[in-house]
A protein has these predicted regions:
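Active-site-adjacent helix-turn-beta-strand microarchitecture at beta-sheet edges
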Residues: 108-119
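Conserved beta strand-loop-helix elements of the APE1-like EEP
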Residues: 83-101
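Short, acidic Gly/Pro/Ser/Thr-rich loop/turn segments
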Residues: 100-102, 137-138
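Short, surface-exposed loop/helix-turn segments at secondary-structure junctions
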Residues: 74-77, 110
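Eukaryotic intrinsically disordered and solvent-exposed regulatory patches
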Residues: 80
Length: 302
């Protein structure tokens, strides 16, 4: 497996720009071989491969996958010396190619500030432990796969906002059902995805061609609403919220947040279908966040 994955990391190194990030979601594995049960550290093997290519490994994230499974025991149950710890987390490995990204032009600096995130989001997103409910999807229309272990939308949404800025191109070498592509659309980024399972193409086309725009835009509003609740809570505690963001008409904690803007998705169109799927996203520019009609409001992160 890792010999094949090494080819992917090599291509990522080739195409990524200086200062760009590589984020890899991987779980460790347990196997019984020749009667011996053991842990196989996939994360360690991938770190070694990426560092050999020249990537710098930055602080990683542990994704603690909350579960309602009634039986999580491995091994001898209640008896000592034969039971094993159940793996309930996966790794999100963070790498950077080369030195920090530079911002020399005024337009580059403006885009970076426009792509900022809220102070309270940073406190959660840049923690090294994430608790996000996992996703398990059964695919009836893809004969080549009995199950697709998609990660939840919130995971790539966070990473894209943390390690890229608006207008950037996000590369997904394991496209699957397009979760990363959807997260990129919601974050006003472009994306390119590759998937070797050709039988997934019709389903992927259906998913990305029929995005529920109202539901997708509800994520943007929900993010804004969570911030308003955060501000209200601080005010009730007589804590200071010092700055104003005139673009989205709310108080913010730091000066770096004052240029943050949101734009709603207008439509997502399939523009090319010869040997690839090409989608174009349009946004409602200049529309204020709090002008959103009440019937469009909701939540996408459940």
């Amino acid at each position: 497996m890792h010999q094949e994955l090494d080819k992917v990391w090599t291509e990522c190194w080739r195409v990524l720009k200086e200062g760009a990030f590589l984020c890899i979601n991987i779980g460790d594995a347990t196997r019984t071989i020749a009667g011996e049960f053991a842990l196989y550290n996939n994360n360690t093997r991938i770190i070694q491969a990426c560092e050999k290519l020249g990537f710098t490994n930055l602080p990683n994230i542990l994704w603690k996958k909350t579960t309602n499974a009634p039986n999580k025991f491995m091994g001898s149950g209640m008896l000592p010396c034969g039971a094993y710890v159940t793996l309930e987390h996966e790794w999100i490995l963070i790498f950077r190619k080369g030195s920090k990204r530079s911002y020399k032009k005024a337009s580059e600096k403006d885009t970076r500030r426009d792509s900022s995130f809220f102070w309270e989001e940073r406190n959660v997103w840049f923690s090294d432990i994430w608790e996000i409910k996992g996703v398990k999807q059964t695919i009836d229309k893809a004969p080549s796969r009995e199950r697709n272990a998609s990660f939840p939308l919130e995971l790539p949404y966070r990473l894209i906002n943390m390690y890229s800025q608006k207008g950037d191109v996000v590369l997904d070498p394991f496209m699957g059902l397009g979760t990363t592509a959807l997260a990129a659309i919601l974050s006003e980024r472009n994306s390119v995805g590759f998937e070797i399972d050709k039988l997934l193409k019709p389903l992927l086309k259906k998913i990305l061609s029929s995005i529920d725009i109202v539901k997708a835009n509800s994520l943007i509003y929900d993010r804004y609403k969570r911030h308003l609740l955060f501000v209200d809570d601080r005010v009730k505690q007589n804590k200071e919220v010092k700055y104003d963001n005139d673009h989205i008409q709310c108080k913010v904690m730091t000066k770096q947040e004052t240029d943050l803007t949101f734009h709603y998705i207008k439509n997502v169109e399939l523009t090319n279908e010869i040997d690839k799927l090409e989608f174009k996203s349009n946004y409602l520019l200049g529309r204020r966040i709090n002008d959103m009609p009440i019937e469009e409001k909701g939540t996408l992160f459940e």
